Structure formats: structure tokens, C-alpha cells
Amino acid sequence: LASCRSRDQDVSADSRPQVLTTFTVLADLARNVAGDRLQVASIVKPGAEIHGYQPTPSDIERASKADLIVENGLGLELWAQRFTAAAGDVPTITLSEGMKPLLITEDAYSGKPNPHAWMSPQRTMGYVDHLERAFSQLDPAGAEDFAANASAYKAKLQALDQELRKAIAALPAQQRLLVSCEGAFSYLAADYGLEEAYLWPVNAESEITPKRMARLIDTVREREVPAVFCESTVSDKAQREVAAAAGARFGGTFYVDSLSPPDGPAPTLLELQRHNVGLIRKGLDLSESNR
């Protein structure tokens, strides 16, 4: 109890403006731009599913005390509008604002934006620009710091972009079909020349049908895809069944909608991207997997 009180006192004694993001990936971006001038926290904890998250009363209380709320937009946080309305008049920024999104092309979500734009390092730079502007309005005295932090982080994103491009370019052309549970890799695929196939387009784990599974099994078998993957925030049971039926391997767990805990393989967005592309290389490159 004493330690809990101590933590509460530390938070209340911290006079820095409070920034609350909807999920962990955005919190990581915000911390990189904010440096030590702002407090940054995420509503959704590492490992939690973001699409259908239901905010708790304590989440809403935290939001009402924040100075700024940061969301992704593009329909990712289905609960965000109710959440921000319940939080009162706290300013909210949408990091995808002004972006031309890729569109989902099938099922009930056809024509709607794919929300996973942070999976493209190039597009993530736009997120960083939004954060820099919002933080400079929130804390004008820190504007130079925010600009410097944003510039340094965008340089890391640019280097990451080249790193990922080189890694995926090394895959043989016939081995560039990425099979995941959710269609969360459209931006990565578009940037680096991958094809994608998946069990559901977005936010639709409950919509897996025998027909959809059979179609994916046929695709994996016909294209001789060596490995399939799934994301950390959903069950991989169906995808493992696809792998077994098609004669492929289950290639591992991607991180997309959530970072890992600090001691996991993807505690930051940069490490998340490297982890995922490492799995892609290992799973799809037959020469790599046979070493």
C-alpha cells in the first residue's frame, strides 16, 4: 500500500502536461517526440486487442485528467468517439489526419480505410509531424526540443525504411506472399513489394468461416507458401490449422496493434518492425529457413 501511495504521489507531483494515447504503439511514438517534457501513457496495455477494446471507468477518469488525447483514426479505435466524449473537453489529435489511406478491398469492410498506417515507416513520419505540432501547442517552451526530437526520430524511421527494403528485396520474387491472420500488412506490402493474404481483413476474427479458411488453405498450397503467421493480439488457432492443412509451417507471431512488454521482442515500434521483417525473412526465404 505504501508503494502504491508513493507512485500516486509521484504522478500527482509531476507537473508536466499529460498525454494519453489510445494504444502502446502511439505511446512509443509520443515518447520519442516528447522526450522528458511531457508525461505519456497508453490507455490499452501491451498485448491487448485494440479494435474492440472497451474503456473502463478508470480509463475515462484518466482521460478526463489528461491535457491531450492521441488516437490513430481510420476506424481503428471503434470506441474512441464515445471515449473522448466521455472524457469531456480534452483536446484530441488524430495522427492519420490528412493521410490518403489504403482501402480494404473485400468483405463487409470493402471501401473502408485500412487503419494500420504505422506499419509503413514512411507514413509514420506523418504521425511524428502531427505529434510535434500538437506538443508545441501544448508546451510552447518545448517547441525546439520537440522539433529536434522529431527530426532525430524521423532519421531513424528513414534508416529503418532502407533496412526493411533491403531485407525484403532479398526474398526471391516467387516467395513474397505474406499470409497473416489479419490484413494488417497492406502498407508494409505496398512499400516493399509483398503480396498479402489473410483470414480476415480487419477487426473481424469472429467472421472466420470454413469457406474463408478453405480458400486460404488452397492459396497457401497452390503458391507453395512455406510459412504463415499470426498477430500477437488474436488467437493463432485457425492459422495453425491453415498451416497444418496446407503443409506449411507456422512461422511465428507478429506484433502490429500492440508492442510487447519491455522484456519482449517488440518493446518499441522500431523493434516491432525489425522483429516482424525478421520473421518474414526466416519464414519465406527457403534458403534462409534451411540453414
PLM regions and their residue ranges:
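Extracytoplasmic metal-acquisition and chelation regions
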Residues: 4-291
